[in-house]
Every structure is written in structure tokens, then in C-alpha cells.
Amino acid sequence: MTNTERNIIKIIKELSLEEGFAIQTFSFDWIIKVNDKYIVGYNFDINSSAASAICNDKAATYEILNANDICAVEHNFFMSPKNAKYLGEEQDYTEILNKLKKYKYLVLKPNNGTSGEDIFLVNNEDELKERLELLFTHYQSIAISPFINIDKEYRIIVLDNEVKLIFSKNLPNTTRCCNELVKFNLCHGAIPEIVEDEELISKLSNIALKAVKIIGINFASVDIVDTEGQLKVLEVNSGVMMEHFSRKNNEYYEIAKGIYRDAIKFMLK
């Protein structure tokens, strides 16, 4: 999918006609100017740079949420060896190896990665060394998590401390094995479905609203996982992408359009 083919481009062009704001596009439609504000990718000129930076750092997000008693999936920060000098304290391979011995299975991923790319499950030292070398070749830092079995994943979109949408990311009907790394990303084939259970909506909303308040972000999508009956924040995204959601059917397209309409109005006020 090229930048021009993104639904957000189509939606914003429609909204410009309906709402009467001017738009310009730059960088092959990756940047959209709306009146005197900018949308870069899926990041609206609504959030502070600090809040956005926290969201783009998986380990920092975990630390902040955990420090404020918000249940989140553990992410531990490790800098690549060539950049470790900037930490002011030593990090070494032994620390990572000890985590593998403790938890048996570890998940390794880029600390600022997106779209479920370059995520690896390891359960022995040879795999660990191989994956660490690969990741540190391409990324300055990684996040390491104890493996957890995820039963379900939800996305909650929040604007100005109000929940706008909650949907689950349902996996296609495939056989799953215990201790298997499963990606619930929509771009990897998961199917969005709006959550209608009122009790679940209340629980997810409560967690998401606490998370965005602590981070201080105005427009975000919060991913929450159900692991053995416990709800945990997986990550908070400062870029609100609804491409795959909006492509499911016309109803979902109009919902996404309504959220982007509200976000632009909030941005321009």
C-alpha cells in the first residue's frame, strides 16, 4: 500500500470538503497540512513531543505505567553494545542470559518498533545470541519481555480523555500451540471486531484512560492483552492508525472517519 492509497488520505480529503478546511500534502502524501497544523503519518499535532516519545519507547512506557500501578506487559530496556556508553551504567549479556534462565522463554523486539516486525521468541542460549546480534545490527536498543500466552488483544482509541472506539483483534481460525509467539497485528491478518460486551468495555476503558492520563497523551490507541484472565497494557501508540479497521466494511470506515473528524476539530480549535 502506497502513501497515496491510505484510507486516511481519502478520509481527510472528504473531511476537507465537508468541514471546509484547507489541506496540502508533502513527502509523497506522508505529511498532510490541515490549515496551519500537520499530520505526519498517523501522528496528529495534538500530543506533546514528550508524550509521543514515551509512547514510542516500549520500555519507558512499561516503567511509567508500572510505577503508577497500571498493569502492563513487562518490557526491559537494553542498549546495543556500541551505544551502551550513553547509559552511564553497565549492561551486559549475563543480565539477559539470567532472564532467559529465569523465564525459560523471552520475547525480543526493537524498543521503538512497529507493526509487529522483527519480534522473536527464544528459549535457548544459541537462539538468544543469534537474535541479539541480528537486532543490535539494525537497532540502537531493544526491549526484552518474559513470554506470556496471550488469549486476546484489544485496541482502545482515546481522544481528549474520551474512549472513541474499542475493538478486538481476532485471529483467523488456526490451531495455536502453547508457548507460541502469536501476532495480533491487523497487518498480519488479524480481523477487527467492535467490542459490545458492556462489562468488558468498562474494564478496558478504565485501564486505557488511566494509561493515557499518566503519560499525558491526548490522542492515542492503547493495546491491551488478555493473558490468562488478566488485562495488561501492551503498548500505547501516539499514531492512531485505522487503515485495516476502516477497510473491513462501510460501517467501520464511517466510524474511523468520525474519529478522525473529531481529532482534526480538536487539533484546529
Where in the sequence are the language-model features?
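Active-site nucleotide/adenylate-binding loops and adjacent lid/helix of ATP-dependent enzymes
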Residues: 33, 41, 50-152, 202
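C-terminal active-site "lid" helix and adjoining low-complexity regulatory extension at the edge
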Residues: 195-199, 213, 226-269
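Non-cleavable N-terminal signal-anchor transmembrane helices
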Residues: 1-36
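Phosphate-binding site of ATP-dependent enzymes
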Residues: 117-206
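A short beta-strand motif that forms the metal-chelation/ATP-contact edge
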Residues: 31-41, 155-159, 230-244
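A short glycine-rich, hydrophobically flanked beta-strand micro-motif that places a catalytic Asp/Glu
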Residues: 142-146, 155, 217-228
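Anionic group-transfer/hydrolysis microenvironments
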Residues: 111, 147-148, 157, 223-225, ...
